[in-house]
Design a protein with these regions (language model features):
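Alpha-helical segments flanking ligand/cofactor-binding loops in enzyme cores
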Residues: 5, 30, 74-75
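Secondary-structure junction motif
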Residues: 16, 22-29, 35-57, 124-133, ...
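Residue-level recognition of the GNAT/N-acetyltransferase active site
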Residues: 17-18, 106, 119-121
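Periplasmic-binding protein-like
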Residues: 10, 107-118
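Short beta-strand-centered segments that line the small-molecule binding cleft or hinge
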Residues: 1-12, 16, 26, 52-53, ...
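Hydrophobic hinge/microswitch elements
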Residues: 41-101
C-alpha cells in the first residue's frame, strides 16, 4: 500500500453521564483510576493507542466492562457510573444523542493519526488520484470538532 499522508488527528476524550461524581470539575488521576471503565477491545482500533499509553505509564484502570464495539458505549454509560475514553468525534456524537458529558482525560494521550491508503498499483490511475485528492480536500474543510485540541472538551 502507498500512504497519501495524514488527513487529520483525533484527540481522545473521556465520556461520562451528566452528573457523574468525578466529572463535575474535571477528573483527577485518582478519580480516573478509581472509576469503573467501559473499554473497547478489538485489534486495530484506536483504543489500542490509549490503552498502550496508559499501560506504559504504569497506571491500572478499574475495567468494569469490555465491548468489541463503540456503538454500545453511550447506552451503557448514560445509565451508569462507567466512564470511557473515546476519539473526540465519537464523544461529540455520543454527547449529542445520549446526553453524555465530555472532558479531557487526566493523563496525556497521544493523538490518533488518520491517513488514507490505496494500492500502489493504482497510483497511476487517474480515477484513483482524483479520489485521493478529493478526500484530501474534503478533510481540509472537515468539522473542527475532529481537531486534536482538548481545551473545549467540557
Amino acid at each position: 500500500f502507498a500512504v497519501a499522508g495524514a488527513l487529520f488527528e483525533h484527540a481522545f476524550v473521556c465520556i461520562a453521564r451528566r452528573g457523574h461524581p468525578g466529572a463535575r470539575a474535571g477528573m483527577t488521576i485518582g478519580q480516573f483510576l478509581a472509576a469503573r471503565h467501559a473499554v473497547v477491545r478489538q485489534k486495530g482500533r484506536s483504543q489500542e493507542i490509549a490503552d498502550r499509553t496508559i499501560d506504559e505509564m504504569g497506571l491500572v484502570r478499574n475495567i468494569g466492562l469490555q465491548s468489541p464495539h463503540f456503538t454500545s458505549l453511550p447506552f451503557l454509560i448514560a445509565d451508569s457510573d462507567l466512564i470511557s475514553i473515546v476519539p473526540r468525534a465519537l464523544g461529540n456524537a455520543f454527547a449529542g444523542f445520549a446526553g453524555l458529558q465530555m472532558m479531557p482525560p487526566p493523563v496525556a494521550l497521544p493523538p490518533i493519526p488518520l491517513a488514507q491508503h490505496w494500492a500502489a498499483a493504482s497510483e497511476a490511475d487517474p480515477a484513483t488520484l482524483w479520489l485521493v485528492r478529493l478526500i484530501g480536500e474534503l478533510f481540509l474543510g472537515r468539522d473542527p470538532t475532529l481537531r486534536a485540541e482538548t481545551d473545549d472538551a467540557e
